[in-house]
Amino acid sequence: MFILNTKKNFFAIIINVKIGEKIMKKLAILGSAKSCVLEDILKYFNGKDVEITCLSDDEHCEFFKKAKELNENTKLLPYEINVEYFSSHDVDLVAVCDYRKVLQKEVFETNKFINIHGSLLPAFRGADEISRAFMAGVKVSGVTVHKLTEDIERDEIIAQYPILIENLTHFDEFEENIYKLEGMLYPIVIDKVLKDEVFDFSDFLTSGGCGGSFGGCEGCH
Protein backbone atom coordinates (compact mmCIF):
# COMPACT_ATOMS: atom_id res chain seq x y z
CA MET A 1 0.00 0.00 0.00
CA PHE A 2 1.24 3.48 -0.92
CA ILE A 3 -0.09 6.40 1.19
CA LEU A 4 0.23 10.11 0.41
CA ASN A 5 -0.84 12.43 3.25
CA THR A 6 -0.92 16.23 2.84
CA LYS A 7 -2.84 18.99 4.55
CA LYS A 8 -5.41 19.12 1.76
CA ASN A 9 -5.46 15.59 0.45
CA PHE A 10 -5.25 12.07 1.68
CA PHE A 11 -4.69 9.35 -0.88
CA ALA A 12 -4.48 5.64 -0.26
CA ILE A 13 -3.41 3.67 -3.29
CA ILE A 14 -3.41 -0.09 -3.05
CA ILE A 15 -1.10 -1.86 -5.46
CA ASN A 16 -1.30 -5.61 -5.92
CA VAL A 17 2.08 -7.17 -6.58
CA LYS A 18 2.72 -10.85 -7.02
CA ILE A 19 5.87 -11.65 -5.13
CA GLY A 20 7.87 -14.76 -5.91
CA GLU A 21 5.91 -15.66 -9.02
CA LYS A 22 8.10 -17.96 -11.11
CA ILE A 23 8.42 -17.63 -14.85
CA MET A 24 8.57 -20.93 -16.71
CA LYS A 25 11.64 -21.10 -18.95
CA LYS A 26 11.33 -22.86 -22.30
CA LEU A 27 14.07 -25.23 -23.42
CA ALA A 28 14.23 -27.04 -26.75
CA ILE A 29 16.54 -30.04 -27.12
CA LEU A 30 17.45 -30.69 -30.75
CA GLY A 31 18.94 -34.03 -31.81
CA SER A 32 18.98 -36.52 -34.66
CA ALA A 33 21.18 -39.42 -33.62
CA LYS A 34 22.21 -40.78 -30.22
CA SER A 35 20.53 -40.06 -26.91
CA CYS A 36 23.63 -40.18 -24.69
CA VAL A 37 23.04 -36.81 -23.03
CA LEU A 38 19.25 -36.54 -23.33
CA GLU A 39 18.36 -38.62 -20.30
CA ASP A 40 20.86 -36.74 -18.12
CA ILE A 41 19.33 -33.40 -19.12
CA LEU A 42 15.78 -34.58 -18.46
CA LYS A 43 16.76 -36.03 -15.09
CA TYR A 44 18.51 -32.81 -14.07
CA PHE A 45 15.51 -30.61 -14.91
CA ASN A 46 12.90 -32.94 -13.44
CA GLY A 47 10.81 -30.87 -11.04
CA LYS A 48 12.35 -27.56 -12.11
CA ASP A 49 10.43 -24.67 -13.67
CA VAL A 50 11.55 -25.49 -17.20
CA GLU A 51 9.26 -26.51 -20.05
CA ILE A 52 11.13 -28.93 -22.32
CA THR A 53 10.40 -29.88 -25.93
CA CYS A 54 12.46 -32.55 -27.70
CA LEU A 55 12.86 -31.92 -31.44
CA SER A 56 14.24 -34.17 -34.16
CA ASP A 57 14.13 -34.51 -37.93
CA ASP A 58 14.29 -38.32 -37.68
CA GLU A 59 11.52 -40.20 -35.91
CA HIS A 60 13.50 -43.44 -36.13
CA CYS A 61 16.66 -42.18 -34.41
CA GLU A 62 17.66 -43.19 -30.89
CA PHE A 63 17.21 -39.62 -29.63
CA PHE A 64 13.56 -39.35 -30.70
CA LYS A 65 12.68 -42.85 -29.51
CA LYS A 66 14.20 -42.22 -26.08
CA ALA A 67 12.34 -38.92 -25.71
CA LYS A 68 9.01 -40.61 -26.48
CA GLU A 69 9.86 -43.51 -24.19
CA LEU A 70 10.38 -41.05 -21.34
CA ASN A 71 7.00 -39.43 -22.12
CA GLU A 72 8.58 -36.10 -22.95
CA ASN A 73 6.95 -33.51 -25.17
CA THR A 74 8.31 -34.50 -28.59
CA LYS A 75 7.91 -33.01 -32.04
CA LEU A 76 9.11 -34.20 -35.43
CA LEU A 77 10.81 -31.18 -37.01
CA PRO A 78 11.79 -31.61 -40.67
CA TYR A 79 15.04 -29.87 -41.48
CA GLU A 80 13.38 -27.72 -44.13
CA ILE A 81 11.14 -25.92 -41.62
CA ASN A 82 13.74 -25.21 -38.92
CA VAL A 83 13.75 -21.48 -39.63
CA GLU A 84 9.96 -21.25 -39.68
CA TYR A 85 9.60 -23.21 -36.44
CA PHE A 86 12.18 -21.33 -34.39
CA SER A 87 10.94 -17.99 -35.73
CA SER A 88 7.39 -18.67 -34.57
CA HIS A 89 8.06 -20.37 -31.23
CA ASP A 90 9.18 -18.52 -28.13
CA VAL A 91 12.09 -20.62 -26.86
CA ASP A 92 14.64 -19.33 -24.36
CA LEU A 93 17.37 -21.75 -25.39
CA VAL A 94 18.02 -24.54 -27.89
CA ALA A 95 20.43 -27.20 -26.63
CA VAL A 96 21.80 -29.22 -29.54
CA CYS A 97 22.61 -32.88 -28.87
CA ASP A 98 24.30 -34.85 -31.65
CA TYR A 99 22.42 -33.15 -34.47
CA ARG A 100 23.89 -34.49 -37.71
CA LYS A 101 23.07 -31.64 -40.09
CA VAL A 102 24.44 -28.14 -40.50
CA LEU A 103 21.82 -25.70 -39.28
CA GLN A 104 20.71 -22.97 -41.66
CA LYS A 105 22.34 -19.59 -41.07
CA GLU A 106 18.92 -17.94 -40.72
CA VAL A 107 18.15 -20.16 -37.74
CA PHE A 108 20.73 -18.43 -35.57
CA GLU A 109 18.86 -15.13 -35.87
CA THR A 110 15.87 -16.61 -34.06
CA ASN A 111 17.18 -18.14 -30.81
CA LYS A 112 20.15 -18.88 -28.63
CA PHE A 113 21.77 -22.16 -29.65
CA ILE A 114 24.41 -24.06 -27.72
CA ASN A 115 26.11 -27.37 -28.46
CA ILE A 116 28.23 -29.95 -26.68
CA HIS A 117 31.33 -31.34 -28.39
CA GLY A 118 33.44 -34.32 -27.36
CA SER A 119 36.83 -32.60 -27.52
CA LEU A 120 38.61 -29.54 -26.22
CA LEU A 121 37.85 -27.08 -28.99
CA PRO A 122 39.37 -25.78 -31.17
CA ALA A 123 41.13 -29.16 -31.32
CA PHE A 124 39.33 -31.91 -33.29
CA ARG A 125 36.51 -29.77 -34.59
CA GLY A 126 33.93 -31.66 -36.65
CA ALA A 127 32.65 -35.23 -36.69
CA ASP A 128 34.23 -38.30 -35.05
CA GLU A 129 36.12 -36.07 -32.65
CA ILE A 130 36.40 -38.69 -29.92
CA SER A 131 38.04 -41.33 -32.08
CA ARG A 132 40.23 -38.78 -33.87
CA ALA A 133 41.55 -37.45 -30.56
CA PHE A 134 42.30 -40.94 -29.31
CA MET A 135 44.00 -42.05 -32.52
CA ALA A 136 46.11 -38.88 -32.56
CA GLY A 137 47.65 -39.99 -29.29
CA VAL A 138 46.84 -36.86 -27.29
CA LYS A 139 47.24 -37.17 -23.54
CA VAL A 140 44.52 -34.68 -22.67
CA SER A 141 41.11 -34.38 -24.30
CA GLY A 142 37.73 -33.49 -22.87
CA VAL A 143 34.39 -31.83 -23.48
CA THR A 144 33.38 -28.37 -24.67
CA VAL A 145 30.05 -26.56 -24.43
CA HIS A 146 29.92 -23.67 -26.87
CA LYS A 147 27.56 -21.25 -28.54
CA LEU A 148 26.47 -22.06 -32.06
CA THR A 149 26.62 -19.27 -34.62
CA GLU A 150 26.48 -19.08 -38.39
CA ASP A 151 30.29 -19.03 -38.40
CA ILE A 152 31.06 -22.71 -37.75
CA GLU A 153 34.77 -21.93 -37.47
CA ARG A 154 34.17 -19.62 -34.54
CA ASP A 155 33.76 -21.38 -31.21
CA GLU A 156 32.36 -19.14 -28.47
CA ILE A 157 33.31 -21.40 -25.61
CA ILE A 158 31.09 -21.42 -22.51
CA ALA A 159 32.67 -24.29 -20.59
CA GLN A 160 35.34 -26.95 -20.96
CA TYR A 161 36.48 -29.86 -18.83
CA PRO A 162 39.50 -32.12 -19.39
CA ILE A 163 40.05 -35.86 -19.35
CA LEU A 164 43.53 -37.31 -19.06
CA ILE A 165 44.31 -40.27 -21.31
CA GLU A 166 46.72 -42.69 -19.68
CA ASN A 167 49.01 -45.04 -21.59
CA LEU A 168 46.91 -48.13 -20.85
CA THR A 169 43.53 -46.49 -21.49
CA HIS A 170 41.43 -48.40 -24.04
CA PHE A 171 39.30 -46.49 -26.54
CA ASP A 172 36.01 -47.88 -25.17
CA GLU A 173 36.92 -46.64 -21.70
CA PHE A 174 37.88 -43.21 -23.03
CA GLU A 175 34.68 -42.90 -25.07
CA GLU A 176 32.54 -43.92 -22.11
CA ASN A 177 34.23 -41.31 -19.92
CA ILE A 178 33.59 -38.62 -22.53
CA TYR A 179 29.88 -39.49 -22.62
CA LYS A 180 29.67 -39.54 -18.82
CA LEU A 181 31.33 -36.14 -18.61
CA GLU A 182 28.98 -34.71 -21.25
CA GLY A 183 26.01 -35.95 -19.24
CA MET A 184 27.24 -34.23 -16.08
CA LEU A 185 28.47 -30.96 -17.57
CA TYR A 186 25.83 -30.11 -20.18
CA PRO A 187 22.76 -29.93 -17.88
CA ILE A 188 24.54 -27.58 -15.47
CA VAL A 189 25.66 -25.28 -18.27
CA ILE A 190 22.17 -25.27 -19.80
CA ASP A 191 20.74 -24.29 -16.42
CA LYS A 192 23.22 -21.43 -16.10
CA VAL A 193 22.48 -20.11 -19.59
CA LEU A 194 18.72 -20.25 -18.95
CA LYS A 195 19.25 -18.18 -15.81
CA ASP A 196 21.54 -15.74 -17.65
CA GLU A 197 24.31 -16.64 -15.22
CA VAL A 198 27.98 -17.23 -15.91
CA PHE A 199 29.17 -20.82 -15.62
CA ASP A 200 31.81 -21.39 -12.96
CA PHE A 201 33.68 -24.61 -12.26
CA SER A 202 32.59 -24.42 -8.63
CA ASP A 203 29.03 -25.08 -9.81
CA PHE A 204 30.21 -28.26 -11.49
CA LEU A 205 32.33 -29.44 -8.58
CA THR A 206 29.78 -28.74 -5.85
CA SER A 207 27.17 -30.66 -7.84
CA GLY A 208 29.38 -33.74 -7.65
CA GLY A 209 30.35 -33.40 -11.29
CA CYS A 210 33.92 -34.57 -10.93
CA GLY A 211 34.49 -37.51 -8.67
CA GLY A 212 37.94 -38.34 -9.94
CA SER A 213 36.67 -41.10 -12.23
CA PHE A 214 38.07 -39.58 -15.41
CA GLY A 215 41.72 -40.29 -14.76
CA GLY A 216 43.74 -37.53 -13.20
CA CYS A 217 40.87 -35.18 -12.34
CA GLU A 218 42.60 -34.34 -9.09
CA GLY A 219 45.49 -32.90 -11.03
CA CYS A 220 43.27 -30.55 -13.01
CA HIS A 221 42.42 -28.30 -10.05
Residue ranges of predicted features:
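One-carbon transfer enzymes
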Residues: 2-221
